[in-house]
């Protein structure tokens, strides 16, 4: 599972906006794109990729990311490191977010859910679709895109989908 990044804004416990994380001024941005080496998996067949400068074309090779989460260090995760509180971000913070979610889902089910990508692509409504922003080369678009994949998690909906 490839993880992309967003910048999330919230108020009163509710998400007010979520866009592609691309903070060029401070050098941080989520990656994403289309592989030159890995074949298109069956669960990505029929998808398109949208470039930042416009234009959409069929996805012909493996596209990443599959999913995303808050990666902006300005809106990231409160952690304690060496007795100091700090906020971290980056897509390397999104991967453990997803790992933790899947671990919780596994704990709640009778057996492990296994490889969940096909189920997520079959149930894109289980994710919050991110449709604003770009990562430099690719633009967010409805459905899967090469910035945020299918979107960010709604934990209960993801659990129901897998």
Feature locations, PLM:
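Extracellular protease catalytic domains of secreted zymogens
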Residues: 1-162
